[in-house]
Regions:
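Single-pass alpha-helical membrane anchors
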Residues: 164, 397-410
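A short, Lys/Arg-enriched amphipathic alpha-helix followed by its capping loop at the start of a domain
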Residues: 2-12, 170-171
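Residues forming the flavin
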Residues: 153-166, 179-186, 190-194, 198, ...
Length: 410
């Protein structure tokens, strides 16, 4: 939707084909009667400069959608960290690399308690554990959000999706809902393609931008981005299960989700939503055992590990379905690849890929990253303004060093 907004500002006609019945992306929720979300969210005000800018452009109030989140991971970290853990983290700027995982650079150098925290902290940041997250992503994530306050959703994701849809429709964006891209054939000798949608529409010649997450991208890239594209997407994609526990009289208070993730067998990430009645419990560490755990056993396991009273109902959030043997996922995301991201274009100049697999400055998968890559694509190919850049901790450090040097010289 970011890309559509940027292109309509310069008069480019845009049609969005959306497989869901309304707009919203991974923040989508089916209706306003009961919360049904793919995963709960954390936002960072000063770090999300492009998101705030886009919402302002669309005349959508940030405060109407989001509220301050007071819980934080630092109290639990400070309680558990030993002196050697702080020393290990101080070396991170010197050893962090894109091709080395966080586990590679920290394992064996921290106390057991400190290692456990750093193993599970990436789950809170980007839905992955330390053996998947690159040390670069961890360092840059702190750099990116270190000056920010945490926020979370005040209302259903449907509210934001509907407001963005209305803004886009006003400027002339055409939407085709309940429409999926069923087949994409690349015609290499013609530098063209044929795209077939579920409503029978066929496209060729026009610019087709695949604004998709990793799972559908795996099926759509073919060999257009080279032989390593599918491997990269497979290695960096991840999904989640979200169990929603309904407490009409008020959900129980929970400890910080980092502490619960570090102390439960399934690495659970629970959070009471803003309505105070819904406990959203995300499972990102999808082991083979969890993937083959039937719904009722999964619900019982979550209740036992959280140690909470029985809710009125337990539901599985949208995006995950049980096929009788295994959980299947219709929504996914992707972490930064250890080997680098994919370019917008492959061999075919008429088909582009724009999403979490694209090169981005925002290190963690998020709405901010999505807005950034949408703006970057529009800038590179249509001459629109570049994405905004976040004020980072490193910028402050550099500024202080410059001031220090100037004072010494004087």
């Amino acid at each position: 939707m970011t890309l559509a907004w940027e292109l309509r500002k310069i008069g480019v006609p845009v049609t969005i084909h959306e497989r869901k019945p309304s707009a919203g992306g991974s923040w989508w929720e089916p209706d306003l009667t009961k919360r049904d979300l793919h995963a709960h969210r954390i936002l960072f005000d000063r770090g999300w400069v492009n998101t705030r800018s886009l919402l302002k452009d669309m005349d959508i109030s940030w405060d109407a959608l989001f509220e301050r989140h007071t819980d934080g991971v630092f109290p639990y970290m400070f309680k558990k960290f030993k002196f050697q853990d702080y020393l290990a983290l101080l070396t991170l700027p010197f050893v962090a690399r894109r091709d080395r995982t966080l586990k590679d650079v920290l394992q064996g150098r921290m106390s057991p308690e400190g290692a456990s925290i750093m193993e599970h902290l990436p789950l809170i940041i980007d839905g992955i554990t330390w053996d998947v997250m690159s040390s670069y992503e961890m360092l840059e994530s702190f750099n990116h959000v270190g000056l920010s306050r945490q926020w979370t959703q005040r209302v259903s994701g449907k509210v934001m999706g509907d407001l963005m849809y209305e803004a886009l429709e006003k400027v002339g964006v055409e939407f085709k809902f309940n429409t999926s891209l069923d087949e994409l054939l690349y015609i290499s000798d013609e530098d063209n393609y044929v795209a077939t949608f579920s409503d029978g529409t066929k496209l060729k010649d026009e610019l087709l931008v695949l604004c998709v997450d990793h799972s559908p991208a795996i099926k759509l890239v073919g060999d257009n981005w080279g032989p390593g594209a599918k491997t990269m997407l497979n290695d960096t994609t991840y999904g989640c299960l979200n169990l929603l526990l309904d407490y009409p009289m008020g959900a129980p208070e929970m400890k910080d989700d980092l502490e619960i993730a570090a102390t439960t067998p399934w690495k659970l990430q629970p959070r009471v939503l803003s309505d105070g009645k819904t406990l959203s419990c995300v499972i990102c560490n999808l082991t083979d055992s969890i993937l083959h755990t039937p719904p009722e056993a999964l619900k019982q396991g979550v209740l036992e590990q959280l140690g909470v009273r029985a809710p009125e109902t337990i539901r599985v959030g949208w995006g995950s379905t049980w096929d009788g043997e295994r959980w299947q996922f219709h929504q996914s995301s992707g972490t930064l690849a250890l080997t680098g991201q994919l370019p917008f274009f492959g061999r075919c100049s008429r088909v582009a890929l724009c999403g979490m697999m694209s090169e981005r400055r925002t290190p963690y998968a998020s709405l901010e990253a999505a807005v950034e890559v949408g703006r970057q694509f529009a800038h590179e190919n249509f001459g629109t303004p570049t994405p905004l850049e976040t004020l980072k901790l490193s910028h402050i450090v550099i500024l202080l060093l410059i001031v220090f040097v100037v004072l010494i010289i004087k």
